[in-house]
Regions:
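Extreme N-terminal tail/first-helix region
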Residues: 1-11
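Short, contiguous alpha-helical
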Residues: 9-24, 30-73, 113-167
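Flexible, glycine- and charge-enriched loops at secondary-structure boundaries
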Residues: 5, 82, 126
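Helix-adjacent hinge/juxtasegments
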Residues: 58-103
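Acidic catalytic patch
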Residues: 101-116
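Secondary-structure boundary/capping positions in well-ordered alpha/beta enzyme cores
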Residues: 29-30, 106
Length: 167
């Protein structure tokens, strides 16, 4: 794998930090915002993000998707309010580290099949989990921009921080 396990965990933890930074920019009066009728609302997107990464990481680690675990996590996510959802997302950094703690380099190179597609465990972690986190937080960023947060920029999206003030 091109990334070390520590780098993968660090990248997933960085995604968590970026997501929490962006979520902190949400105007609570706009939690029901959705770009079109068929898309998730801001709150629905956050709830999905509160379970997607850890659940797919677990699937990759175990080499099998657990629909019952996903359903339970989805039910719990749907019951959370905004603050509870952010609190759950805040646990992801530790969750990723715990889920990947006992995964060896050999485990990362092992082939698994998920959702009808085979690849190495490491590649699936990158393509499904890490890429998914980046994609969905970018969707949240676009929602924020659509809701008038014009001051948000590349620093917010990729570094998870506001642009530093000029000296």
């Amino acid at each position: 794998m091109v990334l070390t396990k520590a780098e993968l965990i660090g990248a997933l933890q960085h995604e968590t930090n970026i997501l929490l930074h962006l979520a902190g920019k949400i105007d609570r009066t706009q939690l029901d915002y959705r770009p079109t009728a068929s898309q998730r609302s801001t709150m629905e997107l956050l709830r999905y993000l509160s379970l997607m990464g850890p659940q797919l990481t677990s699937a990759c680690v175990h080499g099998a998707f657990d629909m019952a675990a996903w359903g339970a996590a989805d039910g719990a996510a749907k019951a959370r309010d905004f603050d509870g959802t952010l609190a759950e997302i805040a646990t992801h950094s530790a969750t990723y580290a715990a889920l990947l703690a006992d995964v060896s380099d050999d485990d990362l190179r092992a082939t698994i099949t998920l959702f009808g597609s085979s690849g190495t465990r490491g590649a699936r972690l990158v393509s499904m989990v890490l890429s998914g986190c980046a994609a969905y937080r970018t969707q949240l960023f676009c929602y924020l921009k659509s809701c008038g947060r014009d001051e948000l920029n590349t620093m917010n999206l990729w570094a998870g921080m506001d642009t530093p003030a000029s000296a």
